Each structure stands twice: as structure tokens, then as C-alpha cells.
Amino acid sequence: MSWQSYVDDSLVGSGFMHSAAIVGLADGSYWAYGGTYVPQPEEVTHILKCLENFSLVQSSGVTICGVKFFGLQSGSEGQMKYIFFKKGAAGGCIYTSKQTAIIAVYGNPGDASALQQDLQKTEATYVAVNPADCNTTVKRIAEYLISLDY
């Protein structure tokens, strides 16, 4: 399976997130990505710093595609590190494997625009997602990659 297939089929394709990226822990390079909210290179650099120093998550949050999320929780579990973040009804998570960080976003971080769409009688483009479904899906991919020494 290609790295892009992990994003297209297993992450975004799960329906539990609308955007995802897999980046290298060593250098922040993009291995694969898809969706609307993909972190920009300087945002990936900050995310990697947050994974090394969890206090940054609480003090500065996480920014993805220019949207600032506040950090809910961060820590380590076995060989994985994780960060959970939120903004309004939107949010996401980051899990690491041995060589990658998997970044996922669900919901619409611009809640006001979703409300505006509703007022204009147009359909909102993001479906409500249970955050636990997003987190569990990303965690399982990270665990699988760890089992393959990635």
C-alpha cells in the first residue's frame, strides 16, 4: 500500500476525518496528505516541536492551514506520542509511529461559516464526527506502522 493510500483509504476514506497528513518525524517531509486542512511546512515544524515538548501544546496550541486550535491533551502511550486539539465543533489529533507523525482534522474549524451557510440555506460541507472515532482511527494506523517498524 502506498503512503497516499493510507491517507485516501484508511484515514480520510474512513469518514471520521476530512483531512489528514503523514509527515516524517526526522525532517517534517510530507509522505502523503489529503483534504482541506493540511498543515503548512512551518506548522509541521511547530507540531514536531510540540511532540518533543508537550508544554508547547498548552501554551501555543496547534495551527493547521492557518487555523489555530487549542491543545486539549498530549502525552505518550507506549512507543506513540499524541496530541488532541479542538476549535469549536472541529478538532483533530496527532499520533506518532517510529518514523512518522499522522495528523488528522475533523469538522469545520470555521464554525461561523457553517452557520452562515445554514442561514443562506446552503449545505454545510462537513459532517459531524465523533472525536473518538477520529482518534481511534489514527491511533490504529500509528500502531500498525509501529508494527512494521515505521
From Swiss-Prot:
- Kindly give the Pfam families that the UniProt entry links to this protein: Profilin
Identify one Gene Ontology CC term for this UniProt entry. cytoplasm
Q: What is its main location?
A: cytoplasm
Q: PROSITE patterns, per this entry?
A: PROFILIN (PS00414)
Fetch the InterPro entries from UniProt. Answer: PFN, PFN_euk, PFN_sf, Profilin_CS
User: Record keywords: Nuclease included?
Assistant: no
Localization terms from the record:
Cytoplasm, Cytoskeleton
UniProt GO molecular function? actin binding; actin monomer binding
- Is Manganese among the key words of this record? no
Question: Per its UniProt record, what CDD domains does this chain match?
Answer: PROF
Write the record's keywords in alphabetical order, separated by commas: Actin-binding, Cytoplasm, Cytoskeleton
Function of the molecule: Binds to actin and affects the structure of the cytoskeleton. At high concentrations, profilin prevents the polymerization of actin, whereas it enhances it at low concentrations. By binding to PIP2, it inhibits the formation of IP3 and DG.
Q: How is the subunit organization of this protein annotated in UniProt?
A: Occurs in many kinds of cells as a complex with monomeric actin in a 1:1 ratio.
Q: Which family does it belong to?
A: Belongs to the profilin family.
Q: What is this protein called?
A: Profilin
